[in-house]
Amino acid sequence: SREALFDHIRAECVPLARDAGKGLSAKQAAALCLGAQAAPLFIGFALWIAEQAVLQKLDRLYFFTREGEFFHRVFCALFPQGRLSGYDLPPADILEVSRLSTFAPSMKDASIQEMSRIWSLFKVQSVSGLFATLGLDIGKFSELLETLGLRKEAVISDPENSVELRQLFETPAFAEAVKNSLTIQASMLRSYLKQSGLNAGGRFGIVDIGWRGTIQDNMALFVPGAHFHGMYLG
């Protein structure tokens, strides 16, 4: 059974890790042993990813940076020939994306409604963080922020209902700057995804650590013609 296999893997790996840990610091040796004990979890996750790739008929697998890079190494080590029980597995690549790099490009417009997607996850919003999310230089809007009574270091509770933030988004100069920034970021992301083989019409598996799937949501909005199947370890 698979359980017996994992028990065997653990029994084989732990003694090897103890031997390999000799000469290391106590902290390093403990970390090495912990990794060996967790080997069945990592291997089981990679095996499940391969099974899902076959069952879901996925065209390509993407492991998101940065946590996904480790699992990409595990996956490639387990399936060096790209096959599982006689089935061909899709290509597996690392995709350098983050919540920040995919959110702004996925926005339809510069509006409070679009921002509420991220505010539903985080109930507070720092003013400086807002500008970083939108890809804007906050220094260019110092006068406007002062007029609206918004300090750069301020943290706003319930941002969706903030009068000051609503006024900010309704200011033509700010709205135009956001629109231009979104266009540029969308163009850059679209070019990167195309270069990475991710286009509309494909079936893609994505691998990451977590449970919210925020990046997957952003990607699905940005490439609506693609099918995404998320595989997470949370």
What positions do the PLM features span?
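Phosphate/oxyanion-binding active-site loops and adjacent basic polyanion-contact surfaces
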Residues: 34-46, 67, 178-185
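An acidic- and aromatic-residue-enriched active-site/binding cleft used to recognize and process polar
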Residues: 66-67, 97-100, 209-212, 233
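Extended charged low-complexity segments that act as oligomerization/scaffolding linkers
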Residues: 1-38, 53, 73-145
